[in-house]
Amino acid sequence: MLFRCNILALVGGGRNPRYPPNKVMVWDDHQNRCIGELSFRSEVKAVRMSRERVVVVLEYKIYVYNFADLNLLHTIETASNPRGLCSLCPDSRACVLACPGLQKGHVKVELFDITRTTIVPAHESSLGHLSTNLDGTRLATASERGTLVRVWDTKSGQRLHELR
């Protein structure tokens, strides 16, 4: 659901799915109709939305679309991402996307507002979770082991804190 509005992203799944698991339906609940469709060759693992972007996560790729017209803006290659890990900053002034990098335990931080990419060598083992703060300046990561949470600066990639 996009903030507190009537726009939803739906992906098929479960026992009797209405839609296939490789399709994203952008649904306007106020109009009670589909306002956009995105189809892929593989299963959709996650969808993130902001006022400007729709981000679709597949196991090895992430697609970033313009929200207004669903035009493709970026394609990002990732390492295997079966959990659909991805964080999109909701602040419209800072378009920040964090996702798994190409190497195990690394995070790729895309700073779209200043067209810069930062690679963060977050953990030695595979990522278990990642999340940005509301204004996109910080990134928190945990590995699959779950023994450490690390906090990073998104612009510099510098580690700020480590919590056990």
Short names for language-model regions:
Residues 2-4, 49-51, 91-93, 134-135:
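Residue-level detector of Asp-centered blade-edge/turn motifs that repeat once per structural unit
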Residues 16-21, 56, 100-105, 144-145:
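Short, solvent-exposed loop/turn segments at conserved positions within beta-propeller repeat blades
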Residues 42-48, 80-91, 125-132:
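Canonical WD40 repeat/beta-propeller blade segments in eukaryotic WD-repeat proteins
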Residues 46-70:
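Hydrophobic alpha-helical hairpins/lids featuring a short glycine-rich hinge
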